[in-house]
C-alpha cells in the first residue's frame, strides 16, 4: 500500500471507487460508502442523484471493517498532506438480496471451495463453475445493460458533485 500512500499525498482531489459484484438487489447497483465518510448517506444521495447509497454498517448493508475503502481513508488521514478524498464501493448485486438468494450465494462459494480443495465429478465441477460465474458476472444481457447504466449514472453524479465535470 506504499503506492497508495505516495499517491494520496501528492494529489489534491481523489475519487477512489472499489468495484464489487455479488451482494445487493439484482438490478440495482449500490453505492456503499465508508464509515469514515463525513457526509450523511442522505446528503450523498441528494448530491450525486443516485437512488441507492448505503453506509458501511449493518443497518444499511452488512457491517464491514478493514476493506479497501476503509484502508484508503485511514492512509489519507495519516498523510502529512491529505487529499480531498471520496472513496466508495460500487456493489453490483448479481443474485438478489432475498434470504434464498443469499443462501444461493453461499452455496456457490462453498461449492467453488470444495472444487478447489478436493477433486469432484465433472458434473459437479460444471455446476459449481456455472454458479460462481453467475454470482460474479451474470450472463443475462439485461443485467449487464442495467449494471452499465447504473455505473454511468453514479460515476457522472459523483464527478459532477465533486466538480470534475459539468
Language-model segments: residues:
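C-terminal accessory segments enriched in acidic
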Residues: 1-166
Amino acid at each position: 500500500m506504499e503506492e497508495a500512500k505516495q499517491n494520496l499525498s501528492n494529489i489534491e482531489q481523489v475519487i477512489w471507487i472499489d468495484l464489487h459484484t455479488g451482494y445487493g438487489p439484482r438490478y440495482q447497483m449500490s453505492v456503499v460508502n465508508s464509515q469514515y465518510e463525513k457526509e450523511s448517506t442522505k446528503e450523498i444521495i441528494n448530491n450525486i442523484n443516485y437512488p441507492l447509497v448505503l453506509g458501511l454498517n449493518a443497518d444499511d448493508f452488512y457491517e464491514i471493517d478493514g476493506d479497501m475503502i476503509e484502508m484508503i481513508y485511514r492512509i489519507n488521514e495519516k498523510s502529512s498532506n491529505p487529499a480531498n478524498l471520496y472513496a466508495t464501493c460500487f456493489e453490483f448485486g448479481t443474485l438478489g438480496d432475498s434470504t434464498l438468494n443469499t443462501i444461493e450465494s453461499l452455496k456457490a462459494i462453498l461449492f467453488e471451495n470444495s472444487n478447489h480443495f478436493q477433486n469432484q465429478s465433472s458434473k459437479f465441477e460444471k455446476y459449481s463453475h456455472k454458479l460462481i460465474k453467475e454470482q460474479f458476472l451474470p450472463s443475462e444481457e439485461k443485467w449487464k445493460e442495467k449494471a452499465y447504466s447504473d455505473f454511468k449514472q453514479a460515476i457522472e453524479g459523483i464527478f459532477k458533485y465533486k466538480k470534475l465535470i459539468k
